[in-house]
Structure formats: structure tokens, C-alpha cells
């Protein structure tokens, strides 16, 4: 299954950034990519999504959504989702 996840994610490579986008080839953002990959592989339904978030991360919403729908692991594996937290300079 992990190989299918990677293959589907790679199919989105040329999709431009679009805030809250969810359409391959049209636009997607960093939250939408894992959502759409999982949805396209039949791993989740449309309830597995978030919306209404701002362009500037608040530092908690994305982490809370990931904790709700995913299981944390110590070391990343093929197909893992990595969450990066930015700090204002």
C-alpha cells in the first residue's frame, strides 16, 4: 500500500499551489495533498478533510487534524506524512 501512496502523491507533482485546493492539475495545498491522496486511494471518505483555515498557519489546527485522523510514529516510513511547524522570525 505504501508504494501506491507514493505513486499517487507523485502524480500530483506538477499541480500548482492553491490555498485550500483539492483538484489534481488545478491546485492543492499542503493540507490538501495527503487528504486527496488518501481519498483517491479509497482510504478515507469526504469526512476526512479540513477547511476554513487561513493562509498563515496558527501552529495548532493542522497538528490537531493530523492527530485526529493519523497515528504518530517515531521514524518516517515510505508514504508517511511529515508535519513541519514554522515559527515566526
What are these language model-derived features?
Residues 3-6, 46-89:
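...with weaker cross-activation on analogous glycine-rich loops/strands in unrelated enzymes
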Residues 6-27, 47-48:
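Active-site nucleophile-His-acid catalytic modules used for acyl/amide transfer and hydrolysis
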Residues 13, 41-42:
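A broad structural signal for alpha-helix termini and local helix breaks/kinks
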Residues 15-16, 20, 31, 53-56, ...:
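Surface-exposed loop/turn and secondary-structure junction residues enriched for glycine/proline
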Residues 20, 41, 80-82:
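Generic hydrophobic/packing signal
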Residues 22-41:
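Active-site nucleophilic cysteine motif
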